Amino acid sequence: MRNYYIPYDEKCKKVNYLYVLSLYKLAEVDKKTYLYNRISYDTIKDLTAKINSNYKESILSEATTTRYLQKDIYNRFYSVDTDNKVITLKNNFQKQNIDRINKFVIINDKELSFLMASNDTLLIAYYLYLKYYCGYSSSNKIDTTAKQFLEASGYSPKAGNYISKISDYNKILNDNGFIKIIKKRDNNGNERNEYYIL
């Protein structure tokens, strides 16, 4: 089973994770590093077609692909050699500074396929958030709220539609066997969710 090392950053509101995960799925092996971190392309049209081939419906236009390749927010995920038409993913966590090792989320083929099939970049961001904080905890759990996730990620924690979406995501992730949720009361008597990655 192949694992994918996704650089993690909470401030993900402007990140199109459908685009990012598609690049990870397309990556070929770099013979020097033995990592799946290399995407070669002939033209922007060719690259856009490759990215869109991972979805039932197109998620990008050629203009959007061009813009994303130039956009600073995606620098954390890859570097682009426009002369040789090669994208190199920044997924070599072993070469990162020790303080940055935990800035990765590791997902497998099953998780990648599920997240891409969701066609929902907010769901992807939410799952990576849970996985990041659970995956590197000795107890493999996180005690959090929808508002905490939204606030950390740059969304409005007061927006009712986002709160409702997170509730839906909890059910979807739980029903599909990715998380387990245990409800508990805090010291003030407020109900909170305790999340476990399965």
Residue ranges of model-derived segments:
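Cysteine-centered metal-binding/redox modules
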Residues: 22
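Winged helix-turn-helix DNA-binding recognition segment
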Residues: 26-87, 135-194
